[in-house]
C-alpha cells in the first residue's frame, strides 16, 4: 500500500513485484522465485479482496482516497472494510466467525476456550456456525489453515489478545477503545445504557444485539440473557479501570439499568450510566 501510494497511487505490477520481493538467503534461484511469486500474489489478493487496491494485468492502483498515517489507523481502515464486505464474500467470514466466537464464549462462559480446543475442532465449529452461502463448495468453509490466518486478522484489528504462547484471550477492549475515540458520542456527559448499547450494536455488530451477533446466536441455539455478554462486560470494565470511561454504579434505591456478566473479582457489577472521559479518550 505504501509503495503504491509513494508512486502516486498507481504502479506497474512488475515494478511493485520487485519492491515486494524479500531476501531469501541460502535458497536456490528457482525456490526463491517461487516463494517471491507466492508471497506477492497473497499480498495482492488480500489487499484487492478488502477493496484497498484495484489490479489489472499490468497495473496496481489504490482504491482508497488516502492511507492512514500509522499501523493503528490502518487496522481501523481494515476493520471498516471488513464490516462493509458483502455477505457472500470470503472476507465477510472473518467478522462472522468472530460473532460465532462471541456466542461460543457465552455458551462456554469462558474467554479462553480457543486455547482449549484444537484448530480442527474450532474449524468444525465455525464451519457449522457460519452463515450459509447461496452456493456452497465442496471445500470446508473454515479449515485449519484458515484458522491461523483468522487469528492473525482478528488480533490485528483489536479483537483478540495473545497473553502467552498457545494461550489466547478473546478481548474486544482495544477495538471498543478505538471505536469510542472515533465516535461522536458526547464526552464527559452521562449516556444511558440503552443508548450506549445501541451504539455498540450498530458500530460493532458482532457484539450484543448487533446483527452478526443475533444471527450467530440464532444459528447456534443461544438465547441471550439479560446481562451484557462476557466479552463486552470485560471490555467495559477494562476501560473503566483505565479511566477511559466511567461506569456509574447504581446507589441506594437507584434503578439498575444494565447488568454486567458475572465476575467474582470485579468491583462493578451493574451501571445506570456511562461517562466518556474526554481527556483520556482523545489523548
Model-inferred region functions:
Residues 1-283:
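Donor-sugar nucleotide-binding helix/loop cap in glycosyltransferases
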Amino acid at each position: 500500500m505504501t509503495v503504491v501510494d509513494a508512486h502516486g497511487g498507481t504502479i506497474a505490477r512488475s515494478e511493485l513485484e520487485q519492491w515486494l520481493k524479500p531476501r531469501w538467503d541460502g535458497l536456490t534461484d528457482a525456490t526463491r522465485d517461487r516463494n517471491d511469486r507466492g508471497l506477492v500474489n497473497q499480498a495482492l489478493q488480500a489487499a484487492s479482496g478488502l477493496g484497498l487496491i484495484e489490479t489489472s494485468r499490468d497495473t496496481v492502483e489504490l482504491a482508497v482516497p488516502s492511507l492512514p498515517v500509522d499501523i493503528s489507523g490502518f487496522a481501523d481502515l481494515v476493520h471498516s472494510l471488513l464490516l462493509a464486505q458483502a455477505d457472500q464474500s470470503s472476507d465477510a467470514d472473518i467478522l462472522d466467525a468472530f460473532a460465532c466466537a462471541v456466542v461460543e464464549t457465552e455458551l462456554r462462559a469462558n474467554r479462553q476456550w480457543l486455547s482449549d480446543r484444537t484448530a480442527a475442532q474450532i474449524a468444525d465449529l465455525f464451519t457449522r456456525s457460519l452463515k450459509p452461502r447461496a452456493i456452497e463448495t465442496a471445500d470446508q468453509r473454515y479449515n485449519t489453515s484458515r484458522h491461523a490466518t483468522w487469528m492473525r486478522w482478528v488480533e490485528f484489528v483489536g479483537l483478540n489478545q495473545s497473553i502467552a504462547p498457545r494461550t489466547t484471550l478473546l478481548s474486544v477492549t482495544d477495538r471498543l477503545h478505538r471505536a469510542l475515540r472515533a465516535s461522536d458520542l458526547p464526552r464527559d456527559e452521562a449516556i444511558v445504557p440503552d443508548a450506549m448499547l445501541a451504539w455498540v450494536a450498530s458500530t460493532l455488530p458482532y457484539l450484543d444485539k448487533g446483527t452478526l451477533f443475533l444471527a450467530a446466536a440464532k444459528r447456534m441455539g443461544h438465547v441471550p440473557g439479560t446481562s451484557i455478554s462476557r466479552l463486552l462486560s470485560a471490555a467495559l470494565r477494562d476501560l473503566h479501570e483505565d479511566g477511559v470511561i466511567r461506569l456509574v454504579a447504581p446507589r441506594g434505591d437507584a434503578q439498575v439499568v444494565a447488568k454486567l456478566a458475572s465476575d467474582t473479582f470485579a468491583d462493578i457489577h451493574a451501571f445506570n450510566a456511562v461517562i466518556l472521559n474526554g481527556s483520556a479518550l482523545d489523548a
